[in-house]
């Protein structure tokens, strides 16, 4: 949201994440709203992000799809991971803010915000 370009070192991650997001989008045949993706350390601190946030590496996106519940979006992401269609990573559900965090960290992490 601060308009900073993703550093060259992280662009491979953001491309892999974008590929996964496109696969998720295809499941619903609807646009994904990306609320937050790559963050600079300064922006991450301002928005209250974790100091070890995957957003800092360009590996994470907070997403929503109009008309789809957080629970349905998260369960679809989980299924796609289990099927090997997208990269294993973190899924955080934030029903009060109406978004799902998905990241491609490479290992399983689940939480509720």
Which ranges hold each PLM region?
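Short, conserved helix/loop micro-motifs enriched in His/Cys and acidic residues
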Residues: 1-8, 45-60
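Active-site acidic/histidine clusters and adjacent loop/turn architecture
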Residues: 1-31
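N-terminal start-of-chain detector that recognizes signal peptides
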Residues: 5-7, 32-38, 71-76
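A short linear-motif detector with a strong N-terminal bias
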Residues: 12-15, 39-44, 78-83
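Short His-Asn-centered micro-motif
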Residues: 13, 35-37, 66
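Amphipathic alpha-helical interface surfaces
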Residues: 13-20, 30, 43, 59, ...
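Extended, low-complexity, intrinsically disordered C-terminal regulatory tails
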Residues: 21-48
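Catalytic cores and adjacent binding grooves of peptidoglycan-active enzymes
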Residues: 52-113
